[in-house]
Amino acid sequence: MKIYLVGGAVRDALLGLPVKDRDWVVVGSTPQEMLDAGYQQVGRDFPVFLHPQTHEEYALARTERKSGSGYTGFTCYAAPDVTLEDDLKRRDLTINALAQDDDGEIIDPYNGLGDLQNRLLRHVSPAFGEDPLRVLRVARFAARYAHLSFRIADETLALMREMTHAGELEHLTPERVWKETESALTTRNPQVFFQVLHDCGALRVLFPEIDALFGVPAPARWHPEIDTGIHTLMTLSMAAMLSPQVDVRFATLCHDLGKGLTPPELWPRHHGHGPAGVKLVEQLCQRLRVPNEIRDLAKLVAEFHDLIHTFPMLNPKTIVKLFDSIDAWRKPQRVEQLALTSEADVRGRTGFESVDYPQGRWLREAWEVAQSVPTKDVVEAGFKGVEIREELTRRRIAAVANWKEQRCPKSN
């Protein structure tokens, strides 16, 4: 029996990155031997065991053979005669097909070290094409390591295109697509994930609402980048700089979906695209089974982001109504989230990356003023039932009006 550290732990250590999880491959053993040594079996489809002390995963070396459609259609073979090289060959990328023995020596049968040095994401073998989930995984790795200047090898991107055009991605379940997407949204450069999917044609299959934005022009005066698809990825990049929250990043990604519905004869203007985009956000989220909290914020951002841009022109009643509409009284975090997504929208444009966004500050200030109006004062004043809500709203509007007179500049 020989045990090797494999995959991500080896890769990230060589890149000088923190190692989170360590996975091990056991060569020359059987399930019974592992159980006799005190390991606990956890894998149903193939033999994976938990170490009795560290609880890290130890998998018997195995091979995989395509036996059905999609990413689950594989037959696994695990036996003592499966070599380390056999096991590493089934992995997706060469940089993930590295192993390290007890002496610290790196075993590299597929030139993963060379690809690490050259910052290349390259598939190990043609078997890559048998698993459609790998298209999303490579896009996610491209996003994860973009700050280290990694790029996808030409032949790997070509294979991803072939897989997409062959309809392989249609076998992916919504849950797996969302899981990979959510993971990509946590990276430093989530926009790269969607750019890669666009480059290989997968965006049209998995995110048609986003793909439809590419080639749709916006007024050059406000959008020097012109293309709405490019603007969308720029805003996502900016959102990633402003907030680590997946819901903020996803909402920013979806903020302009309504522009994909504008008839070409009306281009480059997109009047009413915000409210129009809400149903597309709902459609996308329903298809991918996006969590409700993330979906709800994305719908609100689509509907109201342009309203925030015009904040100096809003009257106090409209401002308080906005807080009602986003349910800020029960979910106050939405004010900050709306401020961040609107800022990402404004700064996610060519030449506008460093502009100030005072509307975000004014939104936050107006919220502090409105929510500081004490409910108990209204009750103690003798108001009852529905009158409490009406009087509370009136006082909030008055407080915001007073603040706006002093702090918020008047529009021209």
Curated annotation (Swiss-Prot):
PROSITE patterns linked to this entry: HD (PS51831)
Entry EC number(s): 2.7.7.72, 3.1.3.-, 3.1.4.-
Gene3D superfamilies: Beta Polymerase, domain 2 (3.30.460.10), cca-adding enzyme, domain 2 (1.10.3090.10)
Free-text comment on the cofactor: Magnesium is required for nucleotidyltransferase activity.
GO molecular function, one term: CCA tRNA nucleotidyltransferase activity
Reported cofactor(s): Mg(2+); Ni(2+)
Residues bound to Mg(2+): 21, 23
Domain HD positions: 228-329
CDD domains, per the entry: HDc, NT_ClassII-CCAase
Signal peptide: none
Positions bound to CTP: 8, 11, 91, 137, 140
Binding-site positions, ATP: 8, 11, 91, 137, 140
Catalytic activity: a tRNA precursor + 2 CTP + ATP = a tRNA with a 3' CCA end + 3 diphosphate; a tRNA with a 3' CCA end + 2 CTP + ATP = a tRNA with a 3' CCACCA end + 3 diphosphate
InterPro entries: CCA_bact, HD/PDEase_dom, HD_domain, NT_sf, PolA_pol_head_dom, PolyA_RNA-bd, tRNA_CCA-adding_enzyme
UniProt keyword annotation of Acetylation present: no
GO biological process: RNA repair; tRNA 3'-terminal CCA addition
The keyword Iron is assigned to this record: no
Alphabetized UniProt keyword annotations: ATP-binding, Hydrolase, Magnesium, Metal-binding, Multifunctional enzyme, Nickel, Nucleotide-binding, Nucleotidyltransferase, RNA repair, RNA-binding, Transferase, tRNA processing
Note: A single active site specifically recognizes both ATP and CTP and is responsible for their addition.
Family, as annotated: Belongs to the tRNA nucleotidyltransferase/poly(A) polymerase family. Bacterial CCA-adding enzyme type 1 subfamily.
Domain comment in the entry: Comprises two domains: an N-terminal domain containing the nucleotidyltransferase activity and a C-terminal HD domain associated with both phosphodiesterase and phosphatase activities.
Functional note: Catalyzes the addition and repair of the essential 3'-terminal CCA sequence in tRNAs without using a nucleic acid template. Adds these three nucleotides in the order of C, C, and A to the tRNA nucleotide-73, using CTP and ATP as substrates and producing inorganic pyrophosphate. tRNA 3'-terminal CCA addition is required both for tRNA processing and repair. Also involved in tRNA surveillance by mediating tandem CCA addition to generate a CCACCA at the 3' terminus of unstable tRNAs. While stable tRNAs receive only 3'-terminal CCA, unstable tRNAs are marked with CCACCA and rapidly degraded.
Subunit structure: Monomer. Can also form homodimers and oligomers.
Official protein name in the record: Multifunctional CCA protein
Provenance organism: Escherichia fergusonii (strain ATCC 35469 / DSM 13698 / CCUG 18766 / IAM 14443 / JCM 21226 / LMG 7866 / NBRC 102419 / NCTC 12128 / CDC 0568-73)
Gene: cca
